[in-house]
Amino acid sequence: MSKLKKYSFSTFSITFLSWGMIAVYTQIKNIPFGSSIALYILYILGVIGPAIAGITVSKRSDSKEDFSMFLKSCYQPTKNLNWYLFIIVIVLVFSLLPYFVVGGEQIVLVQIILLQIPIFILIGGLEEIGWRGFMLRELTKRIPALTSTLLVSIVWIFWHLPLFFIIGTYQYEYLNIPVFSISVISFSFLLSTVYYKTKSIFLCIMTHAFCNSVLNVFVSNQSLLGGIIALVFSLFIYLLFVNNSNRSLIMKKVDTYIE
């Protein structure tokens, strides 16, 4: 079995087993998953399924040197501060542009964004060890970057599906699958941009956590238009910074400055 097949099997086994049990229990009892500590622990286990699978498969399949580099990329901060500024800007535009266009609600103080980041590193950010750190990396060895990003997006959408059946999740309460799917693809392109340009899993983790935190403060009205706006922006950023063909001289200078 190839590394990608092992990773996919492990990820979906961990997550679907954990979230599947929660979905069945919450539906039978008609209670939100957050009402039980045991259910919440199962929820977190499902969330970090991609990280567990990525680390496990990498340890068993890669050389000691490659595995060590993989782990280091997960926890070692990037020293170039320009990349952090880049991430802050693209995440804020990605999150707030739909909010201001289609409307929404600010549910807590802006200061909460920074305070929530550690929580969203655990609930969201660590996924990047598996999705971008392992799966995208392995796919890019075999197929073009754009195709790899699209494939990860599709798998990522399917991975989230149990959340739509768990009472108390944001997906169950507020989202529909088509709009959510567009949002996942949009976010995937943004994260791919960060990964392809930096090769840093740590920065992908921080990007995911920061974006989740912003979206938890500024909650946009769920609409097809909002999803399309986010998708257009993420594709724009991807094409500017990742697709090296037909790039303007100005954008190449911007790219050089960031690096």
Residue map of PLM features:
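Specific transmembrane helices
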Residues: 3-124, 216-259
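Hydrophobic core positions of alpha-helical segments in small-molecule transporters
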Residues: 7-10, 86-87, 148-152, 206-207
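Small-polar-interrupted transmembrane alpha-helices in polytopic inner-membrane proteins
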Residues: 15, 91-95, 148-161
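Active-site His/Glu-centered metal-binding helix of metallohydrolases
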Residues: 17, 126-130, 134-135, 139, ...
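Juxtamembrane helix-entry segments on the extracytoplasmic side of multipass membrane proteins
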Residues: 105-117, 168-182
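Residue-level hotspots within the lipid-embedded alpha helices of multi-pass solute transporters
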Residues: 120-125, 153, 157, 180-185
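Membrane-interface helix/loop boundary segments of multi-pass membrane proteins
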Residues: 127-153, 196-203
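Functionally important transmembrane alpha-helices
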Residues: 175-231
